[in-house]
Amino acid sequence: MKASQFFISTLKEAPADAEIVSHKLMMRAGMIKKLGAGLYTYMPVGLRVIRKVEQIVREEMNASGAVEVLMPVVQPAELWQETGRWDKMGDEMMRVKDRHERDLVIQPTSEEVVTDIARTEIRSYKQMPVNFYQIQTKFRDERRPRFGIMRGREFTMKDAYSFDRDAEGLKVSYEKMYGAYTRIFQRFGLEFRAVAADNGAIGGSGSHEFHVIADTGEDAIVYSPDSDYAANIEAAEALAPAMPRGAATEALTKTHTPKRAKCEAVAEQLGIALQRTVKSIVLAKDVEGGEPQIWLLLLRGDHELNEIKASKVPGLADFRFATEGEILRAFGTPPGYLGPIGTKQPVKVVADRTVAAMSDFVVGANEEDFHYTGVNWGRDLPEAEVYDLRNVVEGDPSPDGKGTLAICRGIEVGHVFMLGTRYSESMSATFLDENGKTQPMMMGCYGIGITRILGAAIEQNYDARGIIWPVSIAPFEVVICPVGYDRSEAVRAEADRLHAELAAAGIDVILDDRGERPGAMFADWELIGVPFRVVVGERGLKDGKLELQGRRDEAAAAVAPADVLATLKSRLAQ
């Protein structure tokens, strides 16, 4: 391809509303153009990257035995009403009416539609396993679209849905998809981690997220450097302390702590470690036809509540944080001085595993400007129910018993779920087993954010000059930059010869024949991020050399024209 037959439109400065690196560089490189809030046109450079991402995904999905379909973007509301998600999805799901006043959905995902396909097409256990996948547009009406394509409203996603006869079959399908995803991200050339995850709103049992590692990632990834253990922060288990609880050595004392509403301030006044303080978090669980049930969760002063874990405490599903009025009624004091001793109303007390192992600790006294010191379980307050309630921190023991935990940042780009029978039961997607009995299908779902991959890849691979694409998903593998293409017959002839030679060898190459000055030409392609550049100039030709430089190379190498193809093949294969 020649640049004169392509479309290149770069910017020296990013638009003012571009917040993160990938958004800025995609706008500057002319990959995307903003149309509205969270809505982008993919320009030729960006679309070429998308097509390469799609190709890798499609090849690995097909190799895994999945079958491609294409489901409509607009879907009837009746299917979503069957599963209850018409009401549960909230405002992120775009609802519209057609001219006949029929309710429709602009799909955010396709569990309902694919389950409808399965219940009408699959009758017998002999037709399973089957895995349908699509690469299709999705729409989620984000409250605050931001970060370019990383949190846009319209995006492209690969979503797959497996159907099996039993849990064992689902496990096999899940492992196939896990393996396919691993190969996909390896082929992308990105540093990534697959981590154990919570299933969230989609539901089901097993779940893993695939994260591209990047310092700017929104998600905290927990892993052990000494093993394969990895999980997102929501799912990582915080083990109970290995040491048993120490004996009480202090008397219970009510201590004046004026204007010390935070654990840090209390610890500073008392001259103790923050780890000896306990924070109180008040939750409420609404009861139909009655007063809300108030819960008091106790965490060590330096730890943070994990809301996902809290929601899994028996009786705390769908909790909310208590209002100030509810707190005053239950404890008689505003937040900052709350504790489990001497509450005004009965509350349900739950302690984190770490707190349950503490002795001689500090809690609020349920009186403004006062805390209790020397608090001990069994003596000063009854033993509480104990659960894992907190986020892990660096240095915690790994749940697999191998080493201690480290934390990095990641961008979620893929997710695999074991759905089980959640959708098949609600939509009556059943089959006849070998005994002629009706059984619900076991489902799995598997998503990859196709367009999100672009942003994540850039967040991981860039420098001051622009994007640095991995070879497999770069818009072009090689750019030929002739200096004086429109002035020198020798330069033009060699550039055209090399372009034809590389293209014939199957290399994705573009020849910049726009006649730009060398500095501007080089800057454009460094910004766009093409992995390799070959410079053809009169001076080099006189010496029998061309300049070849990788995007990450500090300097160009002089290569004989006859050796460029072999050199590039070797570099591209690395």
Swiss-Prot record:
Annotated protein name in UniProt: Proline--tRNA ligase
Note on domains (UniProt): Consists of three domains: the N-terminal catalytic domain, the editing domain and the C-terminal anticodon-binding domain.
This protein's UniProt keywords: Aminoacyl-tRNA synthetase, ATP-binding, Cytoplasm, Ligase, Nucleotide-binding, Protein biosynthesis
Subunit structure: Homodimer.
Gene Ontology MF terms in the entry: aminoacyl-tRNA deacylase activity; ATP binding; proline-tRNA ligase activity
Swiss-Prot/TrEMBL catalytic activity: tRNA(Pro) + L-proline + ATP = L-prolyl-tRNA(Pro) + AMP + diphosphate
InterPro entries according to UniProt: aa-tRNA-synt_IIb, aa-tRNA-synth_II, aa-tRNA-synth_II/BPL/LPL, Anticodon-bd, Anticodon-bd_dom_sf, Pro-tRNA-ligase_IIa, Pro-tRNA-synth_IIa_bac-type, Pro-tRNA-Synthase_IIa_type1
